[in-house]
């Protein structure tokens, strides 16, 4: 005889318990006589019922019957089908779980009934399995983090050693750039001085040959030059009195007239020298 048949009362019909009378009588269940009737809740089928101590089962059955005040029946299909059909009642798993939790806590330091025993939390083992499966992944992640931290610390220790050569390379590059800039400036200065040196003789030659872009200095007008040329043809050397007269006639100073006659004599001397050389070369056949 199984433990299920020990605490099941087959003589009672499906009705309210005598310990908790109700004003209105509940009609008996309209099931066939060959069905085994139960006075309390049966959570498991007969072959699936756990073979544990009957004391815990009775306490749990009394607790559920006292808290709910109603019963329900389970119908087995004559053994041909293993399924069970619970009759609609006021049974709630949350209420039974709460009352059972209170009962075990008030009685003493007895351990709480396992949820898997009463079928309240069937998915709990899967959760535990997922946690156990996730713990190796967490451990591997922590190991990777520790290895990464050690690697970064080693790199940080090695960085000061590499920092010195890098700083030296940067200094060398900056020095090379500075030296190249200095050389470029020196070359520019040399080129500027060279152009200045070449331009000075060019300007001097242009000034001598009167080929420069600057206009020649011409302080005398045409009328003044003509009057001075006429006087020079008559007399190459002027007295002080004559010089004063000419200066008044052409509206020039005494000094200007004096300088003009000096320059004109030098020009005449140069022309006579060139003419003499030309005559000599033509006579002696120098080519």
Swiss-Prot record:
Which residues fall under the DNA-binding region feature?
Answer: 213-272
Gene Ontology, cellular component aspect: nucleus
Name the domain of life: Eukaryota
Q: Which Pfam families match?
A: Homeodomain
Instruction: Report the gene name.
Output: hoxa10a
**PANTHER family from the UniProt entry:** HOMEOBOX PROTEIN ABDOMINAL-B (PTHR45874), HOMEOBOX PROTEIN HOX-A10 (PTHR45874:SF1)
Q: Does the keyword Hydrolase apply?
A: no
Provide ranges: composition bias, Polar residues: 93-109, 149-158
Annotated segments matching region Disordered: 70-210
- Spell out the subcellular localization from the entry: Nucleus
Give this protein's Gene Ontology molecular function annotations.
DNA-binding transcription factor activity, RNA polymerase II-specific; RNA polymerase II cis-regulatory region sequence-specific DNA binding
* UniProt name for this protein: Homeobox protein Hox-A10a
Biological role: Sequence-specific transcription factor which is part of a developmental regulatory system that provides cells with specific positional identities on the anterior-posterior axis.
- Key words, A-Z: Developmental protein, DNA-binding, Homeobox, Nucleus, Transcription, Transcription regulation
Q: What family is it from?
A: Belongs to the Abd-B homeobox family.
């Amino acid at each position: 005889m199984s433990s299920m048949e020990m605490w099941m009362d087959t003589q009672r019909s499906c009705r309210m318990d005598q310990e908790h009378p109700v004003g209105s009588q509940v009609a008996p269940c309209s099931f066939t006589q060959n069905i085994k009737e139960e006075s309390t809740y049966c959570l498991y089928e007969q072959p699936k019922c756990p073979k544990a101590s009957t004391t815990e089962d009775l306490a749990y059955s009394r607790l559920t019957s006292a808290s709910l005040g109603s019963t329900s029946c389970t119908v087995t299909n004559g053994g041909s089908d293993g399924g069970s059909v619970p009759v609609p009642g006021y049974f709630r798993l949350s209420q039974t779980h709460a009352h059972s939790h209170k009962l075990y806590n008030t009685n003493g330091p007895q351990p709480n009934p396992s949820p898997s025993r009463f079928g309240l939390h069937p998915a709990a083992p899967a959760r535990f399995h997922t946690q156990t499966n996730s713990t190796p992944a967490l451990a591997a992640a922590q190991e990777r983090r520790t290895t990464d931290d050690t690697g970064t610390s080693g790199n940080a220790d090695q960085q000061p050693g590499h920092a010195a050569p890098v700083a030296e390379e940067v200094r060398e590059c900056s020095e090379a750039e500075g030296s190249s800039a200095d050389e470029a400036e020196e070359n520019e200065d040399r080129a500027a001085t060279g152009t200045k040196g070449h331009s000075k003789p060019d300007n001097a030659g242009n000034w001598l040959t009167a080929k420069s872009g600057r206009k020649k200095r011409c302080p005398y007008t045409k009328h003044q030059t003509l009057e001075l040329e006429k006087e020079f043809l008559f007399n190459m050397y002027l007295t002080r009195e004559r010089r004063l007269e000419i200066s008044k006639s052409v509206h020039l100073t005494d000094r200007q007239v004096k300088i003009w006659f000096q320059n004109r004599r030098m020009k005449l001397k140069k022309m006579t020298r060139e003419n003499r050389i030309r005559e000599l070369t033509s006579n002696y056949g120098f080519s």
